[in-house]
Structure formats: C-alpha cells, structure tokens
Amino acid sequence: MYRTMMKSKIHRAVVTEANLNYVGSITIDEAILNQVDILPNEKVQIVNNNNGARLETYVIAGERNSGTICLNGAAARLVQPGDTVIIIAYALLSQEELQSFHPKVAIMDESNRVKQMIEQEPPMTVL
C-alpha cells in the first residue's frame, strides 16, 4: 500500500506578486525550491493564511535568491501581494520508504529567506 505524505513544505512565505495574465502556476525562488526538494513542474498545494483559500497548481522556478513567490493565472484571484501562504508538495510512499522518510520543511522569514529547516513539525507549535 502507498500513502500520500507531505514531502516538502514552505511555511509562511509572503506573496510578492499575483499575475493574472500569466498562463498559470506559481513561480518560486529557485534557491527555496532546492532547499525543500521541489522541482519545476511539480504539483503543489497552496494555502492562503489570510483568506483560507486552498488551490493546486504546478511550480515554475524563479530567479535564484530573489525571494519571489508569485501566483500566476487564475490562482492570482485567490491571493494578494503581502498574503502569507503555505506551499506543500506530496509524495506517494510505500511502507518500506516510510521507515526512513523525513519531509523537508522550510520556515520562512518576512523576506522569503529560509529562517530554519526542520524535518517534522513539533505538535501544537506556533511558528
């Protein structure tokens, strides 16, 4: 049996741009993607902390070290620049893979720089 598990998480990133006229997707700073092991074109879920909206799209790598978090296309209707979001990627893992698996979680600062990397979230934690 395979289980769908959180593989990667970018926690509390700040939206820098919402571009309605782009074809679609989310553009994320390439340096952030590398740290949490998310690839271009990988499917992600985005949770908007400001309004509760949840959506799925795919990733485009943005300029390295730019801090870019840009929602494109229809997704731009669900966010505003300055909103805080959580970006999550999932993986299908076998029981065997689960034994040694650790997700990568990046805790972001207000400038979209990785403040801290953790392998799992402590229970009942406010970050």
UniProtKB/Swiss-Prot annotation:
Subcellular location, principal: cytoplasm
Molecular function in Gene Ontology: aspartate 1-decarboxylase activity
The record's account of how the chain is modified after translation: Is synthesized initially as an inactive proenzyme, which is activated by self-cleavage at a specific serine bond to produce a beta-subunit with a hydroxyl group at its C-terminus and an alpha-subunit with a pyruvoyl group at its N-terminus.
Catalytic-site annotation from UniProt: S25 (schiff-base intermediate with substrate), Y58 (proton donor)
Enzyme Commission number, as recorded: 4.1.1.11
UniProt cross-references to Pfam families, sorted A to Z: Asp_decarbox
Location in or out of the cell: Cytoplasm
Annotated family: Belongs to the PanD family.
NCBIfam families assigned to the protein according to its UniProt record, in alphabetical order: panD
Listed PANTHER family: ASPARTATE 1-DECARBOXYLASE (PTHR21012:SF0)
Protein name: Aspartate 1-decarboxylase
Gene: panD
